[in-house]
């Protein structure tokens, strides 16, 4: 009985610890403004000396009220990310945000955020959005999709492949996203697979995608852009 009584709280502690490690570490003081010039290398950034912190460490004139240029993007979108690299006061706070502009028929291509869940709301226009589950025991990857209108909200679970697409032929769309990490990261699937440096062997990709090497070589020869700013 004693061993049983010991096992349950131990298991619960292990479970809680596992969940805690799955997210950005919680702050242990009021704030920890990132010192990006420090030679110290840690997971995140060391803290700026508190006596040197000022109000501008928590402020950014981001101009998120203004439309962003989508004309230079093959995807027809522009992601303006506000993370700890742009706003040092976000360090240890476990949050960031982005404005996403979509040209007519533009998209934010299938991608993942390895370190963050994303919640998105539409400010203008209409978006067709979705995410795909991880590999399931039955071999399926289930797709969840929804058409969002102005004011609607949608959540993309951490690490899952997701996308947004503006179905309109003549109207742009705008969304604002919040992410549960100071530095969520983004892996655009096509870019990573076909635009890596050095390139992945076409033998590997031809077999993985069940196409011939010519198709792989053609894809690898394309210019794979980054629509995140």
UniProtKB/Swiss-Prot annotation:
Glycosylation sites: 78
Residues the record lists as binding Mn(2+): 111, 113, 118, 162
Signal sequence, renumbered to the chain: 1-22
Disulfide topology: 32-47
Domain of life where this protein originates: Eukaryota
Pfam families per record: Cupin_1
Localisation: Secreted, Extracellular space, Apoplast
Keywords, comma-separated and alphabetical: Apoplast, Disulfide bond, Glycoprotein, Manganese, Metal-binding, Secreted, Signal
One GO term describing the cellular component: apoplast
Domain Cupin type-1, first and last residues per copy: 62-217
This protein's record includes keyword Metal-binding: yes
Subunit and partners: Oligomer (believed to be a pentamer but probably hexamer).
Functional description taken from the UniProt entry: May play a role in plant defense. Probably has no oxalate oxidase activity even if the active site is conserved.
Family as reported in the entry's similarity comment: Belongs to the germin family.
Protein name: Germin-like protein 12-1
């Amino acid at each position: 009985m004693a061993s049983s009584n010991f096992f349950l709280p131990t298991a619960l502690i292990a479970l809680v610890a596992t969940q805690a490690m799955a997210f950005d570490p919680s702050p242990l003081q009021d704030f920890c403004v990132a010192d990006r010039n420090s030679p110290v290398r840690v997971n995140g950034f060391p803290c700026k000396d508190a006596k040197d912190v000022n109000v501008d460490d928590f402020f950014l004139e981001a101009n998120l009220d203004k439309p962003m240029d989508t004309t230079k993007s093959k995807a027809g979108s522009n992601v303006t990310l506000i993370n700890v690299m742009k706003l040092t006061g976000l360090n240890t706070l476990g949050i960031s945000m982005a404005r996403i502009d979509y040209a007519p028929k533009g998209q934010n291509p299938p991608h993942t955020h390895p370190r963050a869940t994303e919640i998105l709301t539409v400010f203008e226009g209409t978006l067709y959005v979705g995410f795909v589950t991880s590999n399931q025991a039955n071999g399926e990857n289930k797709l969840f999709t929804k058409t969002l209108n102005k004011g609607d909200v949608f959540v993309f679970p951490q690490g899952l492949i997701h996308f947004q697409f503006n179905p309109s032929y003549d109207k742009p769309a705008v969304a604002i996203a919040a992410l549960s990490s100071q530095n969520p990261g983004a892996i655009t699937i096509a870019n990573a697979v076909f635009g890596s440096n050095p390139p992945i062997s076409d033998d590997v990709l031809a077999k993985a995608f069940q196409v011939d090497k010519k198709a792989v070589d053609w894809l690898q020869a394309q210019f794979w852009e980054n629509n995140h700013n």
